Regions:
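Ribonuclease/tRNase effector modules and their secretory precursors
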Residues: 1-85
């Protein structure tokens, strides 16, 4: 399995003070995962901590090959915090 970042995943990096390593850590070791649809490739919503302990929300494409592509990453919004309870 290989995980990579699409440029769209970097959209909020400056605003949220996150970098590629933060995104990859949160995507690789998520606390919470849910499928968003049954399309191919499948989209997953993931919540995970970055290297500084901040909770990130991510959307990851899962390909048949097992490779993954992060297409969205940002500081988790309040609406997602309840998912961890």
């Amino acid at each position: 399995m290989k995980i990579s970042l699409h440029n769209s995943a970097r959209k909020h990096q400056e605003r949220d003070h996150i970098n590629d390593d933060d995104i990859l850590k949160a995507a690789t070791f998520p606390l919470w995962v849910a499928a968003l649809d049954d399309e191919n490739p499948q989209r997953e919503l993931r919540l995970g901590f970055d290297n500084a302990g901040r909770l990130l929300e991510l959307v990851v494409l899962i390909f048949d090959s097992g490779n993954e592509l992060v297409i969205h990453a940002m500081k988790a919004r309040a609406q997602y915090l309840d998912l961890l309870n």
